[in-house]
Amino acid sequence: MSLAAPAQVSLYTAVDLALRNSTSVRVATADVQKAVAIVNETRDVYLPSFYVGSGIGYSYGFPVGQPSIWDMTAQSTLFNYSLPDYIRAARLGLRSTQLTLRDTRQQVVLDTSLNYILLNKTTDELAALDEEAKYSAKLLEIEQQRVDAGVEPRVELTRARLTDARIRLKRLHLADEAAVYRETLSHQTGLPAASFITDSKSIPATPEFASGGDLNLLIAGANQGVQSAYAAAKSKQYAAFGDNRQQYYPLITFNAQYNRYARFNNYDLYYKNFQSNNFGVGVQITIPLFDMVKRAKTRESAADASRSYAQADMLRDQTEEQALRLQKSLAELSLQAEVAALQLDLAQSQLETVLAQLSTGSGQANATPLSPRDEQNARIEERQRFEDSLDAEYELTRARLSLLRTVGSVEDWAKSLPNR
């Protein structure tokens, strides 16, 4: 069995493959195709339907049916006052499924992008932890030597062992998470999980949002999920209108039929005037007078429409609340990322200071001399601050992309990615 060679995959490629491979997108696409068929089915009742049949068979005695060699019938609706409402309902149903498809694509783009960025972050953290583990092993060796020499209490060795154990535990946890992210991306894109390697250069900066902007207008006009819910509710409202009109307005249909009768059945012996060719054409008018079933159906349709509007309002409110929560969290997450970056800068400066003092001395007569242990601690601290910075930056990116998803723009952001 041949194993797939590792391949670097850009974010653009991952998103594009996920949109092509997604089962939820395929389901939503099938719903759109079904809705198109429903529109055609509802509209085409005005077009005549033609049927051809035959009833050839042996008979004996008095006629019990029509000795038809073959027959042709045609029928269509001429007037149905409810039909325009049903056509409007079908078209709005199609609009709802199209919006649902776009909303599904938005979610696929968000999920794939976040998993990709998270895998890239985890990969960087694992590389930092590998370096941190080397420094921890060196620190553990130094502490062991100092304890053996009797110049350091055993508690310092225990502290170094604890630091090393925490690093190994975190690395094990992140390695397991990276495997899960690769498997998830494999399911989303169709690529082998073991060969999935991210490209950090393909991840662009996420757009910033104004803290004082009103997102409610954006949500009402751009969130496909909310728009789909209202389109579905309006579709059911038109269907309820159509059901209501069926109680009061007549139905007029067109019918035509031609029959070619056989003579070998001897039916002409029993009929005074028998002929082989027979044709009939006319209209059928059905006037509703009293139908409790249709009345109940009307009430059912009206209640269903009211329920759909209430669900659409609830979804709109929930989406607006989620957007507001994300918008308010951006300022805090941005400051947290800034704090983490400053802590990283500080740790790097402290590391440079320690290395300089170990190389040339502090230059102060009364200063406590630094040891290789201080160097390893400074290196470990710098790597930990780097990992914290990665975590803070990811949380900010996740919030921004989630907000883009809420206002219906995350797919536009994905299309702007460089095609590598």
Model-derived regions: residue spans:
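Acidic, glycine-rich loop-and-beta core segments that form the ion-binding/anion-interacting portion
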Residues: 215-261, 279
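Periplasmic alpha-helical coiled-coil/stalk elements that build and connect Gram-negative outer-membrane
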Residues: 9, 107-222, 326-333, 360, ...
